[in-house]
Amino acid sequence: MLRRFAATGPSPTLEDLEAAAATSGRAAAEVVADLAAYDFLALDDHGRIRAAYPFSALPTAHQVRLASGIEVWAMCAIDALGIPDMLGTDAVITPAAPVTSDTITVTFTGGHTTWQPPTAVVYIRQRSCTGPAADVACGALNFFTSRRTARIWARQHPDYTGKTVDHTQAEALGRAVFGSLLTTAKPAEE
């Protein structure tokens, strides 16, 4: 499912997933329902995939252009930062900053990352309630042009709790959550 998002941009349909699900002797709808129950993805009111972390089926403030030219949407800032490592590709992330609506650019090239403006930060927050990550956390994990604008946003959203992290911390979080998600373990040699 994640590879399909990365290859095409849009969310896969149940029909797109049927062949892969059949290899495990299950129907795609059953697999998708199980994944949603464990919060690996989120469904809309019609049972369609609206998110398969880190990807969003709908436009968000976190656009990611992959080296292939495919544009995808991430659920949040940390998800966006994890996509290049997860896919092993260069990418350009262009989120719209809350508060200022300024564009921030985070460029992944050959294992190096550049942030513009250099003062940009990520604010990691969540609501003090339970539910799917898409509803509880994703709306608060944002890029900001500076610590000052992150503080302004935090004051405007007291229902979230969290902190500001710098480039290194934010990239490490994205890598930790998604970096090895699509790698497969090699069997031990005898």
Protein language model annotation of sequence segments:
Residues 22-37:
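Short amphipathic alpha-helical interaction segments
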Residues 1-4:
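Short alpha-helical "packing" element that flanks the helix-turn-helix/winged-helix DNA-binding module
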